[in-house]
A protein has these predicted regions:
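Conserved short submotifs of the Hanks-type protein kinase catalytic core
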Residues: 40-54, 58
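Activation-segment/catalytic-loop signature of the eukaryotic protein kinase fold
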Residues: 36
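Non-catalytic scaffold residues of the protein kinase domain
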Residues: 27-30, 55
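AlphaC helix of the eukaryotic protein kinase fold
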Residues: 1-24
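Catalytic-loop of the protein kinase fold
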Residues: 85-101
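Activation segment signature within eukaryotic-like protein kinase domains
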Residues: 73-74
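C-terminal lobe helix-coil module of Hanks-type protein kinase domains
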Residues: 134-210
Length: 210
């Protein structure tokens, strides 16, 4: 039917958008794309193969990470975010499942809902925004679109990812954090790291690190 064809076409365009976005990026902690092409009406891309699983897999198998290890991963992904933000790209789906390990180095993947925005904050891509509960801030639940987003949207998700790595638990949804704050972190976590998570996961964008 026409509706199914439209849906397939929308997935094809989303797939190509992700591939074209990543293929323009060159950072040691962002997945590498080697080729993008279409054949017989189907879109393909060739990316680096990473066999070691995601940070989510590691935590599910081994439990919470040490603070030293978790911070090392987060700093490297933070560097990747700083790089894409400099190119006016928001990832918008930072979470442990989207960070793979390649020879013990974290690699950010899944730019399928990333957004490119211009200097005035207007969206220049049209794919819908996804929501990963526990990792998405309040603004991703709103109907305002990308005008309500900025780099601090990714910062919230990065802080939520650090929370998960250190506790082995998915953080509460943003609405609960907004009402009740974050649950207490384990005593073994240093005050500085606990404060960094709390700051990154502030409900209001203006209160997060920029």
């Amino acid at each position: 039917t026409q509706g199914i064809r439209k849906e397939i076409e929308s997935y094809r365009l989303k797939f190509l958008k992700e591939a074209n976005t990543i293929s323009q990026l060159n950072h040691p902690h962002i997945i590498s794309i080697y080729n993008v092409f279409e054949e017989n009406g189907t879109a393909y891309y060739v990316m680096k193969y990473i066999a070691n699983g995601s940070l989510k897999d590691i935590v599910e198998q081994q439990g919470a990470l040490s603070e030293k290890t978790a911070l090392s991963f987060i700093r490297k992904i933070g560097s990747a975010l700083n790089y894409i933000h400099g190119k006016k790209i928001l990832h918008l789906d930072i979470k442990p499942a989207n960070i793979l390990l390649d020879d013990k180095q974290p690699i950010l993947i899944d730019f399928g809902i990333s957004k490119r925005y211009d200097v005035s904050g207007h969206q220049t891509s049209s794919t819908p925004v996804g929501i990963s509960k526990g990792f998405a801030p309040m603004e991703q639940y709103s109907q305002g679109g990308i005008k309500g987003f900025d780099p601090s949207t990714d910062v919230y998700s990065l802080g939520a990812t650090l929370f998960y790595l250190l506790t082995g638990e998915v953080p509460p949804e943003a609405s609960i954090v907004n009402e009740d704050g974050l649950p207490s972190l384990p005593n073994k976590i240093t005050v500085g790291t606990a404060q960094a998570i709390e700051k990154a996961m502030q409900p209001k964008r203006k209160d997060r690190p920029q």
